[in-house]
Structure formats: C-alpha cells, structure tokens
C-alpha cells in the first residue's frame, strides 16, 4: 500500500515498504531516546500475506523494530481478503509468534467512495476485526498472539453488550477468555466522554495509550479550546487511579511489546 493511493503492484509495494521502514530506522537512530520502530508491511490485494513475513523479520531482527501494522483489508474498502481468522493468514501469524511481536490492526486509505477513510473505513475495520475474532478460534491456535485495535476499539466499547450477546448466541466462550487475553484497544478517541466510556467498559489491562497528534483529525475543539487529538489530556482527566493511569501510559505497552520493554530496560528505564 502506497500512502493514500494504493498504487503499484506487489513489487512496488515491497520496495515502498522497505524504503519507509528504512526511513523510520533513520529517525530512530537520530532520536533513540524518543522513538522505536513498528513496521509497514508490503500488503497488496490478492497477494498472500505470507509474502510480508520476510519484511517483518528484516525489520525486527536487523532494524530493531518491536511490532508491525497489519491491514485486514488491503483492497481499501472492498474487503476482498479472507477474515483475519482464516488459515491463509497463519503463515504470517507463525512469524509473529516466532518473533514475539504484536500487530496493530489498521487499514490504509479507502478506495471505496462509500467509506470516508478516517470517519468510516478506519472505524469499520476496527469493529470488523473484533467481530472476526469472536467468530473464529484464532487464539486457540496462537495463544501468544497480541493485536492492538486502534481508535478505542472502533464501535466495540459502545456496543459491548451487543458483542457479549453475539458471542453467547454463536456459542462462543465469554469474551474475557475468548478474545480479550489477546486483544487490546488504544486511546485514540477524541472527546472526554468517549475515553470515559472506554475505561468504564474495557478492563484497564487491555488499554494502551495512543495518540494521533499531527495525524487524522486536526483542529481545535470549540467546546474545550484544545486540540481534538490531544488524547493525553483525556487520559489525564479520566476518573482512574494513578496506578491505572501508569498502566495505560507505560506498563501495558511494555507487556504487549516485550521487545520495547527489553530496549527500555537496557536504557535503565
């Protein structure tokens, strides 16, 4: 996937991913106390995900990256790929498990005019991925896999009762044991009530701090006078304990990204 255009074939996507990941590595080398890498994958519509395993391994073993971004829909809104629980994804999951790295589930741009990228496609993908995990048995086969679903988990926290009920109707185990040992949400939610709901519904151990500043939604909220995407402020103001806040800001990430934890320990942190 190239930027927002989805241009090029498998060879172009592979070259572009390598170039982007190498650029990330340059930034890390310039600011090693501030950044660590998570890699882009050379996913293309119709190309087996197993072809991305080599770039993941290169980034982790050679560049020192600690995870990857995984798109459940390389087609850009047409959903031509199999569900994330399908065995066609397993070769890549085997590499994730071997390297002990998590993946953030995140689509690229929308190539479907029905779905605005930021306002619809992203949230659709977050929610769809979670439902796929409910329907499948992926974590029985890969009990150590870890996925982060961004944007507060899409629509999931707001409809938590729906998903609990669907799991029951589909004769799936309860969500805490079936999905939530392996799936985490971030805090990229752009208003205080949304963050408050996330903390009320989802266990604190499943929430990682996330920020999209200089990212998806710019501008100052006229109701607060602060930037919409200043997500740290929402976490700071949430009615949670200092210990839980520390989990969100640091400890949960160190647990989900063990290679990050190892780097920080080497720094004496």
What label would you give each PLM region?
Residues 22-30, 54-58, 66, 185, ...:
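Mid-to-C-terminal alpha-helical segments outside catalytic/metal-binding sites
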Residues 63-66, 98-102, 118, 142-145, ...:
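Glycine-enriched alpha-helix->loop->beta-strand junction motifs that scaffold or abut catalytic
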Residues 36-39, 68-70, 103-105, 147-149, ...:
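Hydrophobic faces of well-ordered beta-strands that scaffold small-molecule active sites
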Residues 32-33, 64, 91, 140-144, ...:
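Proline-centered flexible-loop/turn and helix-kink motifs
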Residues 134-180:
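Aromatic-lined glycan-binding groove of carbohydrate-active enzymes
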Residues 5-11, 110-126, 163-182, 227-232:
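Active-site gating loops and adjacent loop-to-helix segments of metal-dependent hydrolytic enzymes
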Residues 75, 109-111, 153-157, 191:
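Short, catalytically relevant binding-site loops at active-site mouths
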Residues 1-132:
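Active-site gating/metal-coordination segments in enzymes
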């Amino acid at each position: 996937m190239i930027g927002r255009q989805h241009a090029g074939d498998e060879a172009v996507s592979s070259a572009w991913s390598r170039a982007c990941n190498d650029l990330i590595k340059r930034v890390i080398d310039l600011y090693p106390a501030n950044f660590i890498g998570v890699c882009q994958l050379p996913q293309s519509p119709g190309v087996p995900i197993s072809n991305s395993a080599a770039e993941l391994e290169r980034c982790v073993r050679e560049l020192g990256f600690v995870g990857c971004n995984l798109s459940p829909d390389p087609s850009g809104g047409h959903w031509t790929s199999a569900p994330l629980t399908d065995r066609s994804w397993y070769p890549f999951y085997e590499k994730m498990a071997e390297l002990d790295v998590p993946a953030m589930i995140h689509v690229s741009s929308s190539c479907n005019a029905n779905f605005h990228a930021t306002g619809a496609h992203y949230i659709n993908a977050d929610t769809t991925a979670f439902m796929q995990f409910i329907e499948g048995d992926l974590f029985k086969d890969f009990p150590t896999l870890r996925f982060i679903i961004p944007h507060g988990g899409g629509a999931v926290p707001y409809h938590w009762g729906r998903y609990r009920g669907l799991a029951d109707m589909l004769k799936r185990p309860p969500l805490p044991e079936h999905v939530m040992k392996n799936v985490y949400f971030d805090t990229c939610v752009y208003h205080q009530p949304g963050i408050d709901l996330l903390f009320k519904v989802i266990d604190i151990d499943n929430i990682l701090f996330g920020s999209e500043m200089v990212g998806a939604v710019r501008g100052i909220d006229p109701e607060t006078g602060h930037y919409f995407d200043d997500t740290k402020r929402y976490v700071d103001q949430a009615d949670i304990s200092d210990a839980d806040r520390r989990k969100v800001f640091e400890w949960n990430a160190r647990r989900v990204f063990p290679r990050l934890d190892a780097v920080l320990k080497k720094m004496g942190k």
